[in-house]
């Protein structure tokens, strides 16, 4: 991908400048939100596809490390969010002249993102478990939807220890997780003017993105389409089911981005690693890619 950043103005329907993907919640429709998520996916670099699903790069560095998107809420408040291209992990955001970084953000990122702003290190990481402990609620008890995202932006602009942590839980799921999964995108796009509590299907997909990505790549490598280990997910009604092969619906029509998986040295499932700028500063190797420890 030749350009480091993209600006796709959803409200205008066409690119207006190099910089970011943008979405104005005040004019949101089901179609415009889905277009925003699609263009966010498209702005991420990939190293080919596996089973027809874009595979994210194994590593990235320098200006290639991040993509950015802007969100403007009902109150005309705007935040700019930085996303790690290797795992769609949100690492920082800017509100006016202040930028906020998760406490576990690599030091090199501070030199690359939001230059010229006042930098604040948040007193928590972007891990779901940590954010939920700060908020005092599990994700299934925190509302999602466009109205919830609008309120979240306000709570990101006006920092508060607990309220901002809750806001980040909403942000992550309504953007990064929606980019990873069509089902989560559809859940949010069905709630343009109302909120909803995420069901167990949403939560289990969020928790198992790394596991699904790994098993899809292993199954593709063997040529048989069978997972080495089944991945346990939940239906919306809370019943459990196992995904065991690449013919499953979650593989063929739901997961939209794959976290790169590199097998152990000497494994028959080993997949070659692509490094965008070897030896450059700011190199980051993704790990499990999930916002929650499983």
Swiss-Prot record:
Keyword Magnesium: no
EC number(s) from the headed UniProt entry: 3.2.2.22
Signal peptide: 1-19
Family annotation (Pfam families): RIP (PF00161)
Keyword Hydrolase: yes
InterPro entries from the UniProt entry: Ribosome-inact_prot_sf (IPR036041), Ribosome_inactivat_1/2 (IPR017989), Ribosome_inactivat_prot (IPR001574), Ribosome_inactivat_prot_sub1 (IPR016138), Ribosome_inactivat_prot_sub2 (IPR016139)
SUPFAM superfamilies: Ribosome inactivating proteins (RIP)
Catalytic activity of the protein: Endohydrolysis of the N-glycosidic bond at one specific adenosine on the 28S rRNA
Gene Ontology MF term list: rRNA N-glycosylase activity; toxin activity
Domain of life: Eukaryota
Propeptide residue interval(s): 265-294
GO annotation (BP), single: defense response
Chain positions carrying an annotated carbohydrate: 70, 220
Keywords assigned: Glycoprotein, Hydrolase, Plant defense, Protein synthesis inhibitor, Signal, Toxin
Catalytic site: 177, 180
Function, as annotated: Inhibits protein synthesis by depurinating 28S rRNA in ribosomes.
Family membership noted in the UniProt record: Belongs to the ribosome-inactivating protein family. Type 1 RIP subfamily.
Protein name, as recorded: Type I ribosome-inactivating protein trichoanguina
Organism, scientific name: Trichosanthes anguina
Gene (name only): TCA
